[in-house]
Amino acid sequence: MTDTRNGEDNGKLLYCSFCGKSQHEVRKLIAGPSVFICDECVDLCNDIIREEVQEAQAESSAHKLPAPKEISAILDQYVIGQERAKKVLSVAVYNHYKRLNQRDKKDDVELGKSNILLIGPTGSGKTLLAETLARLLNVPFTIADATTLTEAGYVGEDVENIIQKLLQKCDYDVEKAQMGIVYIDEIDKISRKSDNPSITRDVSGEGVQQALLKLIEGTVASVPPQGGRKHPQQEFLQVDTRNILFICGGAFAGLEKVIQARSTKGGIGFGAEVRSKQEGKKIGESLREVEPDDLVKFGLIPEFVGRLPVIATLEELDEAALVQILTEPKNALTKQYAKLFEMEGVDLEFRSDALKSVAQRALERKTGARGLRSILEGILLDTMYEIPSQQDVSKVVIDESVIDGSSKPLLIYENSEPQAKAAPDA
């Protein structure tokens, strides 16, 4: 019997039965009944099987569309609050992909595409909602910044580059890209503004809206396979955008005033209704009453508004919501930093007063949840710098005094008393 481990057969030179390489050309030759296979062919077989399994899983997941309640439940694991926005998004996304699953079947009814507009303050979770949806549905996803986009002929980024980015996310698989999701952020920044002093781009923003309009409503975009205009001889890829779900998001600062002006009853004289400036609703409550005409008055062109029929508004995050964001989601920041410290063999504890203080600081900065990471990074920077070089530290405790800068984190050593130093005077 041959030695199956070393590929030696009584001194004879052995060859792989699949690729024909000799035992000296490969690292390992494995013997079976009258056949041999080398390590390279084993790796190749594993790659083939892995690809086929992944394709089968992707195909099955495409047909297994989660119900709106299931989509919302998964969003709950990552996004705190914003219940109405989750419900609107869940139904819209469910209907969109249900429509795609039915598109090959002959039917008298043609289902239209419902793109989505997310309106909410900075750091309220617009981008996170879109990212989580794409991850849940296992479809290509890309983010574009509307402020960098220009119409053709101006200095800046062409709208077709959005589709290029989407293709890059799925290795230029056109079929996959045509099932993807595109999130366009800062969409409110391309509203028409006659006082825009810029001379290097479309000064009104209307040109960018017109260019995006064609992409969003459905067109066949020609995209070079490997970037830009450097190789004009390359054959362009044709991507049909009719089935790509576009989600546009923006803070729309000042939109609540447009809504309030519309909803406030007019009148003069003794019969007029008197309203103080302080009397009114929170911004989130006002945004919930938004209508297409309000968006047109804000500066979006009517055709563009018409292509975004599903509108979801997000509430401002209060202190309690920010504390929840710090601790509850699967990817909560406190859990992430605790994991980093755990890799050093150290426990990290945030006291409740510290979490409230971090939330208050984020509210003061008006950055919402987006500012939480930078606050924690600044607080933990020195500790993360020192801990890998220190021995016997078993726990780090963060309390309110650390957040306000009056003391350093409390370090607890193995078999010793906790130590904390006062922060140096500013």
From Swiss-Prot:
Component of the ClpX-ClpP complex. Forms a hexameric ring that, in the presence of ATP, binds to fourteen ClpP subunits assembled into a disk-like structure with a central cavity, resembling the structure of eukaryotic proteasomes. Disulfide bonds: none annotated. ATP binds at residues 121-128. ATP-dependent specificity component of the Clp protease. It directs the protease to specific substrates. Can perform chaperone functions in the absence of ClpP. This is ATP-dependent Clp protease ATP-binding subunit ClpX. One of its GO terms (biological process) is proteolysis involved in protein catabolic process. GO terms for molecular function: ATP binding; ATP hydrolysis activity; ATP-dependent protein folding chaperone; protein dimerization activity; unfolded protein binding; zinc ion binding. Zn(2+) binds at residues 16, 19, 38, 41. Residues 4-57 form the ClpX-type ZB domain. Belongs to the ClpX chaperone family. InterPro entries: AAA+_ATPase, ATP-dep_Clp_protease_ClpX, ATPase_AAA_core, Clp_ATPase_C, Clp_protease_ATP-bd_su_ClpX, ClpX_bact, P-loop_NTPase, Znf_CppX_C4. It comes from Ectopseudomonas mendocina (strain ymp). One of its GO terms (cellular component) is HslUV protease complex. Pfam families: AAA_2, ClpB_D2-small, zf-C4_ClpX. Keywords: ATP-binding, Chaperone, Metal-binding, Nucleotide-binding, Zinc. The lineage of its organism: Bacteria, Pseudomonadati, Pseudomonadota, Gammaproteobacteria, Pseudomonadales.
